[in-house]
């Protein structure tokens, strides 16, 4: 199966930006729109002001949209491409164990009590249209990210305790990855895929590449658990900076689950990027020190 994301981008009014985006139009209505046109000698400005309402919640925002068209000598206009908003990975929260009926608007409304919400994404299955049970929330500052993680990790929403994780784990979690080029994957202490569990020692694992920098262990586990029993899910981080290297590994309980994951999730959209899923190479023999 592939995945898609329903997202909301929230910001203050800016006449040269598109501060609000919604990819699931079924939950959006425009009320009392007003249109204005301004014609100059060299350009035409077109703007729409409207109030956005979500019928699923009381969350509402005023939205301003402005597009500028440059008029050519032949009378035709070229539309300037919109500028994409980008946010630091440090401002993004992973939110797992979401109730399947919770959409981006409801999630935004919930997290606004912790600070200014810039963007919200709930991940949906592209085929069925059903929520995958997790998403991402981007706040406007690191302090708000920390406050939201503290406030909502374990928070019960519609009978389900949320799992909220802020940013990459501290570098000390990666000690098991620093004692040799590849030997850490066979270490029973703290590296990836040590002892314990039939899947961990059997090589039933997949490589997951092209990960967004905001994806962590919990996001991987939430996505890949749909294809079978996940023994371990691990994103690989740089030892010095503590930031994601953009890839990771997921270990399953059986080889059949590995094949299911490759077939269903290779090319799936996760946090705005198409992930690459393939069978991982066999671990090298454990080194003796």
UniProtKB/Swiss-Prot annotation:
<dbReference type="GO" id="GO:0009409">
    <property type="term" value="P:response to cold"/>
</dbReference>
<dbReference type="GO" id="GO:0009535">
    <property type="term" value="C:chloroplast thylakoid membrane"/>
</dbReference>
<keyword id="KW-0507">mRNA processing</keyword>
<feature type="region of interest" description="Linker (Gly-rich)">
    <location>
        <begin position="170"/>
        <end position="203"/>
    </location>
</feature>
<dbReference type="GO" id="GO:0045087">
    <property type="term" value="P:innate immune response"/>
</dbReference>
<dbReference type="Pfam" id="PF00076">
    <property type="entry name" value="RRM_1"/>
</dbReference>
<keyword id="KW-0694">RNA-binding</keyword>
<dbReference type="GO" id="GO:0006397">
    <property type="term" value="P:mRNA processing"/>
</dbReference>
<dbReference type="GO" id="GO:1990904">
    <property type="term" value="C:ribonucleoprotein complex"/>
</dbReference>
<keyword id="KW-0677">Repeat</keyword>
<dbReference type="GO" id="GO:0009737">
    <property type="term" value="P:response to abscisic acid"/>
</dbReference>
<dbReference type="GO" id="GO:0009570">
    <property type="term" value="C:chloroplast stroma"/>
</dbReference>
<feature type="compositionally biased region" description="Low complexity">
    <location>
        <begin position="178"/>
        <end position="187"/>
    </location>
</feature>
<protein>
    <recommendedName>
        <fullName>RNA-binding protein CP29B, chloroplastic</fullName>
    </recommendedName>
</protein>
<dbReference type="InterPro" id="IPR035979">
    <property type="entry name" value="RBD_domain_sf"/>
</dbReference>
<feature type="domain" description="RRM 1">
    <location>
        <begin position="91"/>
        <end position="169"/>
    </location>
</feature>
<dbReference type="InterPro" id="IPR012677">
    <property type="entry name" value="Nucleotide-bd_a/b_plait_sf"/>
</dbReference>
<dbReference type="GO" id="GO:0008266">
    <property type="term" value="F:poly(U) RNA binding"/>
</dbReference>
<feature type="domain" description="RRM 2">
    <location>
        <begin position="204"/>
        <end position="282"/>
    </location>
</feature>
<dbReference type="InterPro" id="IPR048289">
    <property type="entry name" value="RRM2_NsCP33-like"/>
</dbReference>
<dbReference type="GO" id="GO:0009941">
    <property type="term" value="C:chloroplast envelope"/>
</dbReference>
<keyword id="KW-0150">Chloroplast</keyword>
<feature type="modified residue" description="Phosphoserine">
    <location>
        <position position="12"/>
    </location>
</feature>
<feature type="region of interest" description="Disordered">
    <location>
        <begin position="158"/>
        <end position="199"/>
    </location>
</feature>
<dbReference type="InterPro" id="IPR050502">
    <property type="entry name" value="Euk_RNA-bind_prot"/>
</dbReference>
<dbReference type="GO" id="GO:0009579">
    <property type="term" value="C:thylakoid"/>
</dbReference>
<keyword id="KW-0934">Plastid</keyword>
<keyword id="KW-0007">Acetylation</keyword>
<dbReference type="InterPro" id="IPR000504">
    <property type="entry name" value="RRM_dom"/>
</dbReference>
<dbReference type="GO" id="GO:0009534">
    <property type="term" value="C:chloroplast thylakoid"/>
</dbReference>
<keyword id="KW-0809">Transit peptide</keyword>
<feature type="modified residue" description="N-acetylvaline">
    <location>
        <position position="63"/>
    </location>
</feature>
<dbReference type="GO" id="GO:0005783">
    <property type="term" value="C:endoplasmic reticulum"/>
</dbReference>
<comment type="function">
    <text>Could be involved in splicing and/or processing of chloroplast RNA's.</text>
</comment>
<keyword id="KW-0687">Ribonucleoprotein</keyword>
<dbReference type="GO" id="GO:0009507">
    <property type="term" value="C:chloroplast"/>
</dbReference>
<dbReference type="GO" id="GO:0003729">
    <property type="term" value="F:mRNA binding"/>
</dbReference>
<feature type="compositionally biased region" description="Gly residues">
    <location>
        <begin position="188"/>
        <end position="199"/>
    </location>
</feature>
<keyword id="KW-0597">Phosphoprotein</keyword>
<dbReference type="GO" id="GO:0010319">
    <property type="term" value="C:stromule"/>
</dbReference>
<feature type="modified residue" description="Phosphoserine">
    <location>
        <position position="6"/>
    </location>
</feature>
<feature type="transit peptide" description="Chloroplast">
    <location>
        <begin position="1"/>
        <end position="62"/>
    </location>
</feature>
């Amino acid at each position: 199966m592939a995945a898609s994301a329903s997202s909301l981008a929230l910001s203050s009014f800016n006449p040269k930006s598109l501060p609000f985006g919604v990819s699931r139009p079924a939950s959006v209505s425009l009320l009392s729109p007003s249109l204005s046109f301004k014609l100059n000698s060299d350009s035409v400005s077109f703007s729409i002001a409207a109030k956005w309402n979500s019928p699923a919640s009381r969350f509402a925002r005023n939205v301003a949209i402005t597009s500028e068209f440059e008029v050519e000598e032949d009378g035709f206009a070229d539309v300037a491409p919109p500028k994409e908003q980008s946010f630091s990975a440090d401002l993004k929260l992973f939110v797992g164990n979401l109730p399947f009926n919770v959409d981006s608007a409801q999630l935004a409304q919930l997290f606004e009590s912790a600070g200014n919400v810039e963007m919200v994404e709930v991940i949906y299955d592209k085929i069925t249209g059903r929520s995958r049970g997790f998403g991402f929330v981007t706040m406007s500052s690191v302090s708000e990210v920390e406050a939201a993680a503290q406030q909502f990790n374990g928070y019960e929403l519609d009978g389900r305790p949320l799992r909220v994780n802020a940013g990459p784990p501290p570098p000390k979690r990666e000690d098991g990855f620093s004692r040799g080029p590849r030997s850490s994957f066979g270490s029973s202490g703290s590296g990836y895929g040590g002892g314990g569990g039939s899947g961990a020692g059997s090589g039933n694992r997949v490589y997951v590449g092209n990960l967004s920098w905001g994806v962590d262990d919990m996001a991987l586990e939430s996505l890949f658990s749909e294809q079978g029993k996940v023994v371990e899910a691990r994103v690989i981080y740089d030892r010095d900076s503590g930031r994601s290297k953009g890839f990771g590994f997921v270990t399953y309980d059986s080889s059949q689950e590995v094949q299911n994951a490759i077939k269903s999730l290779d090319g799936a959209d996760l946090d705005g990027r198409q992930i690459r899923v393939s069978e991982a190479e066999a671990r090298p023999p454990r080194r003796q020190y």
